[in-house]
Amino acid sequence: MEGKGMRKWVYKFHEGNADMRELLGGKGANLAEMTNLGMPIPQGFTITTEACTDYYANEEQIREEIQTQIFEAVGWLEQVNGKKFGDNANPLLVSVRSGARASMPGMMDTILNLGLNDEAVEGFAEKTGNPRFAYDSYRRFIQMFSDVVMEVPKSYFEKIIDEVKTDKKIKYDTELTAEDLKELIARFKQVYREAMDGKEFPQNPQEQLMEAVKAVFRSWNTPRAITYRRMNDIPGDWGTAVNVQTMVFGNKGATSGTGVAFTRNPSTGAKGIYGEYLINAQGEDVVAGVRTPQPITQLEQDMPECYREFIDLAMKLEDHYRDMQDMEFTIEEGKLYFLQTRNGKRTAQAAIRIACDLVDEGKITPQEAVLRIDAKSLDQVLHPTFDTEALKAGEVIGEALPASPGAAAGKIVFTAEDAKRLVKENKKERVILVRLETSPEDIEGMHAAQGILTVRGGMTSHAAVVARGMGTCCVSGCGAIAIDEEAKEFTLGGYTFHEGDFISLDGTTGKIYKGDIQTVEATVSGNFGRIMEWADEFRTLGVRTNADTPADTKKAVELGAEGIGLCRTEHMFFEQDRIPKIRKMILSKTVEGRVAALDELLVFQKADFKAMYEALEGRPMTVRYLDPPLHEFLPTEEEDIKALAEDMHMTVEEIKETCAALHEFNPMMGHRGCRLAVTYPEIARMQTRAVMEAAIEVHVEKGYDIVPEIMIPLVGERKELKFVKDVVVETAEQVKAEKQSDIHYKIGTMIEIPRAALLADEIAQEAEFFSFGTNDLTQMTFGFSRDDAGKFLDSYYKSKIYESDPFARLDQNGVGQLVAMAVQKGRSTRPDLKCGICGEHGGDPSSIAFCHKAGLDYVSCSPFRVPIARIAAAQAALSDTEK
């Protein structure tokens, strides 16, 4: 057919197969595969994803060559079916559906019955001997085409249907007569004409088809589709395919019907056909929930022949694809047709059970089982979720960013203090902390709360990062909230909420509900353990956790962490009884004054480290020395300033002056990290003594072999690291002599300044290990701060400058190059240099795959992300061996 050099833009179903997903999209590839398996598929063809990409490259026009191939395929379809497109005696009708290579909900809706017009509908009525059915099909087509292709709102048409039903005093659409439907068609065309500035509803089937194809291509770039792609790491240049398929009708009477079924339960994973169907209905009716469907088992009574054939074919499909299938089928006058099949979407719990069952049934290997788990979705398994029945009754009042997964319900509080106080007074109290944004001193209140809701901040804001670390549910950046923190109230979704009112948050979807919705605790079951054991067997990357408290450490170890990759020491200073002491240290005018305050802190810091080492039972821990700028510890509230002035025998003015003097214009790049230790070496001395004494004492008391890993943050120069390292070594050796211990210890650094990555070979002369702080490394490489980027990144996504948030997914082109280079340069100086990553990226699957490739030794992430990292590391290793 096609001349030499002509590109193939259109494939008939029998010309493709399941491996052609990239070209034919998921749906097209599966329809091709099912056709080749001899399944009863209404015939059709697929317009490729390349045609979609070409449409965008060609200023949103479909080139002549592609149109020609589409109409040639229509001609073939006419021959196969013995019907003609646009014929008034025996018209060919088709459906038009989108199909990207990754399943994307919210892409373009289906168009059914394309090819009908004022004349063809008469021929169709005659041919089928069923005028009511013919006019109903035309009515649906006008409605779908107007809505989906021309963006005339569905509600306009629904309103007319309701008016006609009220006029005729009837309740259901099915009671409308052929005459009623004719009236609807006339009124629908009138709505179309008004909405389209006087243009008539298109009567030419060729024109209808081309408009529909363009609409599918356009739907690839709707805001909804762009957002979904960003959340699921789907590249924007993939494009979508279009499937054109001969119509079969489930609405021809009592021996026709349509349904959707799964070969296993998508919520639990239990084996067995699960689904529903409707007699005398068209495909979209089931999905749209217009009428209440019957369970699929009822089909056995209604049409036993069809049911048996359906079960046989469903099992054949599952065996062929070796995975749970989600199938759409139609029965036309007793004959069964499959419209599509795909690997079914499922909950994380179901995914784990299905993967294990398929291994037990001998259908897949443990390696395949691990590769099939969507690492990100494991969040669902580890956090509480809402009771499904209770959720149905809940009222959604808003939606924002799903910053930290889980479900939470509780009383509204507006300050961290109140959250802490209420929970202290009553251990069973559940509170939701609602803030404009959170800051480090809110940490205890955040810990006390069941959930956190913020007006500002993105997926990587302070609230989001801390909440994920604690495993607390968090919804962030809900700009629709008007909050009055003074009056302790906020408005959202048309309601005003006061302190003490109940709200519920779903951190997995970002939805906010009115009232108190019941939650169910997560249980980590046997199958979860099996998948994790397999993952550990296949992965080569180590997995550690970022933790600052013994409770977090225990949780992380339970979830499989092999140690701590980042213990932030500053969080230990924010607690009530310690903050006055660190403030004293900061405000002291003399070294003696500072040392005296630090000696008081030493007791606390050492006790913290001992508790951490005990919880770790001999596993390694990397301790990061004090990192934030000092002003973060200073008082802002008037009464705190007064108390501090009294305590230090200073005036309130003096305290305020000192605080003002410490204020920085750009604290992120200011006096922080190792710069503090260079100016105040006594801080590093105190921290070293605390780490060393704790390690030696736990070794003596519990017998664990501990090798302290001391990490100096924010180094950009070898001499700077050497200066601090000398202070650390001097103190460490002193402690060893006092305690008569021969303990080994390591001193390393955080690579978070681009200069450190560029000079990694020099820095490795002093550092025994590197840990990449990718949060700061990303900020400094891009030159925008994590807290401010949210304000403009949305415009960058819309303009397709960036496709994903560089703070959530490691930017492999830029920041990744620095990481890979630093590993290589560092090991050229010190071949046994241990390298890990401890930014938020340590829990992101695509970033973990990069770390595997770059030759890192371990990743470190928040406790609840440890299982995600274990699976992702195994998947990276398995994908490597496949290549």
Please annotate each region the language model reported.
Residues F45, V455-G457, S476-G479, C567, ...:
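Short beta->alpha connector loops at strand-helix junctions that form conserved
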Residues F338-T341, H498-N546, D552:
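C-terminal domain-closing interface element
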Residues K335-Y337, S439-H447, G451-L453, M459-V466, ...:
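Glycine-rich phosphate/ribose-binding loops and adjacent secondary-structure elements
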Residues R97, V524, W534-K883:
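Conserved alpha/beta-domain cores
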Residues D357, T509, F769-F772:
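Acidic, metal-ion-coordinating active-site neighborhood of RNase H-like domains
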Residues K363-A448, I512-I517, F528, M532-D536, ...:
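Protease-associated
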Residues E2-G394, E429-I432, S439-E444, Q450, ...:
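Nucleotide/phosphate-binding sheet-loop regions of phosphoryl- and nucleotidyl-transfer enzymes
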